[in-house]
């Protein structure tokens, strides 16, 4: 029999407790039980006046509102406030009653501009939640996985301008210059002079009058801090690069945000400085991080770099670099035709140049497979930090390393997929790097806290079940009781 009573209870008056309306296994209840949110007061105490002004909005509520937004992947703050108005669990989490007015959607933005801008508040919140994970001994930092993903910026790809920008200095530049000059002196060469041009002369190609290299970049007029990123063969967008490190259990250990046009190997140092002291034994990364500088940095710090095979960039039909054998004793290369390529110089990029004799190569039967140079001289380069790259190759072939590298898809790549699908990290509505760092920090904080809350609840449930079993078998099954105690 069909019942029609859908509209009968709409105008009923009831008395209830807010706490009774939120299920015991609701995610927000589990999160609220997992961490004491009062730590936020200590972080923002210097942002508020102690003895004058109107009473402010509770800082904990102020942080919890965007936390709800990123936890549930709500697209905007305006939509988040609308959801809070009608969602009992959201109101309970914020400490609001049913008749309390929800803060205006612009409240958080104004507080961010006036109080939290140019501070590391959101990174401190991320670190505080990460400390809770450490407290429960859930994190194993011995194996760390590093990768980067791109987040589409709030910028129209057609609204841009081109500008001349100075090439940014590499993090290893000073050390590399020193070792280049030492290497040149060992080979009887003069140290390289600093690049300085006459200011009266016009800039040379790729350079400037002050010696700094320049390049032409595309800059968004909407969000100048984002970077022009090539997404596929036929699509370019302005984006941010989010670099992340996690352990083998999927706990996020650190992050950094950079413009989307910067290569992962250039921005690695900013992330590495945040995580290098947590006890890393092995660091796993993709081919984008396979550079001599990163290999040297990790090995000098006692960390095992696990980097994949990187195919040679040789043209089809030509000998690969691996077919030229390096003789360490005589410091030379031997070509496939058993001819010597002798040391010539060490360039500014840190590469030793080994050249063949053009007169000998002119009559070589393999010339067309070797070089296209007009003088028939073959040049093979070797970085002064190449021994570190060779060490990485030895590590890659060690037993068990292939299986460890395969865990990337189960750890850091899964995190990116979860963040984009469930937490709104596929694109951003924020403009500027600082706001993007806030979004990423809170998103990763809520991902860690969500996982922590579920594990604490699951552990508590198992503990209760274990106690019930222990009571049941205490009098009747001594052997079973002993087994349970050993678990």
Residues covered by each model-derived region:
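Basic, short loop/linker segments at the boundary and entry of helix-turn-helix/winged-helix-like folds
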Residues: 24-67, 72-73, 384
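Generic alpha-helical segment signature
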Residues: 11, 24, 37, 58, ...
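Hydrophobic alpha-helical membrane-insertion signals
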Residues: 1-29
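A short, ordered amphipathic alpha-helix with a cationic face
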Residues: 4-8, 54-56, 98
């Amino acid at each position: 029999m069909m019942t029609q009573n859908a509209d009968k209870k709409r105008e009923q008056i009831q008395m209830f407790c807010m706490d009774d309306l939120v299920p015991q296994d609701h995610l927000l209840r589990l999160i609220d039980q997992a961490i004491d949110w009062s730590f936020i007061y200590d972080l923002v105490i210097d942002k508020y006046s102690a003895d004058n002004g109107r009473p402010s909005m509770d800082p904990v509520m102020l942080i919890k509102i965007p936390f709800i937004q990123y936890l549930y992947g709500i697209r905007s703050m305006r939509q988040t406030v609308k959801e809070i108005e009608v969602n009992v669990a959201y109101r309970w989490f914020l400490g609001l009653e049913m008749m309390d007015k929800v803060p205006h959607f612009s409240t958080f933005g104004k507080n961010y501009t006036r109080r939290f801008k140019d501070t590391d508040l959101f990174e401190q919140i991320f670190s505080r939640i990460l400390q809770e994970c450490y407290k429960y001994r859930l994190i194993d930092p011995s194996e760390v996985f590093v990768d980067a993903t791109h987040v589409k910026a709030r910028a129209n790809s057609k609204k841009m301008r081109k500008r001349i920008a100075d090439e940014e200095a590499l993090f290893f530049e000073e050390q590399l210059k020193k070792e280049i000059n030492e290497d040149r002196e060992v080979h009887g060469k003069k140290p390289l002079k600093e690049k300085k041009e006459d200011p009266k002369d016009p800039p040379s190609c790729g350079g400037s009058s002050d010696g700094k290299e320049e390049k032409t970049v595309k800059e968004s007029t909407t969000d100048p801090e984002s970077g022009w990123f090539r997404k596929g063969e036929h699509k370019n967008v302005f984006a941010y690069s989010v670099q992340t490190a996690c352990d083998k259990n999927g706990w996020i250990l650190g992050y950094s945000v950079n413009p989307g046009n910067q290569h992962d190997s250039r921005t690695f140092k900013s992330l590495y400085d945040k995580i290098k002291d947590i006890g890393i034994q092995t660091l796993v990364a993709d081919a984008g991080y396979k550079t001599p500088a990163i290999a040297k940095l990790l090995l000098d710090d006692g960390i095992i770099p696990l980097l994949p095979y990187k195919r040679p960039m040789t043209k089809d039909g030509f000998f690969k670099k691996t077919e030229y054998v390096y003789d360490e004793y005589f410091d030379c290369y031997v070509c496939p035709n058993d001819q010597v390529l002798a040391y010539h110089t060490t360039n500014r990029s840190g590469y030793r140049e080994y050249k063949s004799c053009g007169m000998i190569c002119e009559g070589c039967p393999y010339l067309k497979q070797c070089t296209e140079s007009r003088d028939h001289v073959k040049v093979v380069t070797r970085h002064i930090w190449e021994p570190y790259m060779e060490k990485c190759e030895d590590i890659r072939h060690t037993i068990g390393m292939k299986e460890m590298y395969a865990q990337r898809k189960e750890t850091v790549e899964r995190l990116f997929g979860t963040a984009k699908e469930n937490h709104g990290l596929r694109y951003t509505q924020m403009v500027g790097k600082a706001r993007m760092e806030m979004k990423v920090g809170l998103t990763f904080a809520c991902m860690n806290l969500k996982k922590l809350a579920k594990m604490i609840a699951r552990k508590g449930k198992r503990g209760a079940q274990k106690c019930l079993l222990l009571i049941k078998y205490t009098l009747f099954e001594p052997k079973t009781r002993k087994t349970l105690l050993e678990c």
